[in-house]
Amino acid sequence: MQYTFLSHMEAAVRNRNNLLHYVKKSGPISRTDIWKRMDISRASVTQLVQQLQSQNLIIETGRSKSGSGRKQRYIEFNGASHKMFAFDWTSRMFYLTNLSGEVLYEKALSFDRLPQPGEFADALVAEAGHVTEMGLYAPEELQGIVLALPGLINCETASLLYSAKLHWQNVDIAQLFCNRIPGKVFIERTGNIMMLGVYNSGESWKESHFQLFIMDADGIGVSAIVRGHCQHGMNFMYGELGHIKLHSSVPCSCGQHGCLEAVISDLFERSGGRITPEILDHLANAVSTTINISDVGEAILVGSYIDMLTREQSDALVERIRGQVTCLQQRNLKIQCAHNSRQLACAGLSAYAFDRLFPVG
């Protein structure tokens, strides 16, 4: 077995990023609390804080009296200093956002038909140019663009491997924006982006195993965070829940028959756009099976099908899922339906950009 070691510079960058992540999650916080909780020397904390301050990534927020009587300076993450263009395909929303998740500009983009990759890039570049002309950010603040797209995504190379919804295959997304939008190009599958939106708000980050299920007319899938990391799979095909097979001859856009998302779409259309008990049964079976396999601590259900549920249907779906989970009484399991997909995607785009700009693993 060969071992690789971090260079001094790589170790310094990782320490800096670890401290920045900690301040983002825990701030406002004192330097003393940082070195106590992170097991980093005082000298290292002082040096790293000075470095992050020089990059305008953290700022001081005032003083607070410590238990020993000394007044300490508190610091917090300065997400407003770094900005990103962002786009979510599901909502067709284009944003200018900062790394704190604040939306500085938003606009719904319309496409008369499914765009070709070049047409898609042209539309986003044009909107980015419009925002730039508005003077909403200083040139040095812009870090690039981050996209949430449906399909199989290689986030490391910023390429889309295959999307049945977009009818794209092997598209180099990074190349589409090269020299057209300053900074980096990040892309991730829609489910992972929404999941990060949930995970970085509220208390969900405390769960070591967390899943988000998209139940949408555009597709069905599951995304997971395990110990703080998005799961992608060996071939970037993690979470293709919509393509598990049922005993049905209904054709799917993937070219096969009987896929869960195709069957549910067919049932939905034949019911006149209503969520029927049969649809709820299929959704409950899929979610409970996934939970039985993965043993998550929290599951969130989102998407257009979930948005259409009445309160009674929502409660019934959750109960059906819980009723099919093995050894429920021995699990610390939380299941809930969320009705804010657009907001989750926007928050997730910002969170994802931060994680990619300042990686810790």
Language-model region placement:
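ATP-binding/phosphotransfer module of carbohydrate and carboxylate kinases, centering on a glycine-rich
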Residues: 1-61, 68-70, 74-108, 115-137, ...
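Short, acidic, Ser/Thr-enriched surface-loop or helix-capping motifs
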Residues: 98, 155, 225
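Glycine-rich phosphate-binding loop and adjoining helix at the ATP-binding site
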Residues: 106-209, 312-324
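Short glycine-rich anion-binding loops that position phosphate/pyrophosphate groups of nucleotides
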Residues: 150-152, 217-219, 305-306
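Glycine/GP-enriched mid-protein hinge/lid loop-to-helix segment characteristic of carbohydrate kinases
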Residues: 106, 169, 182-276
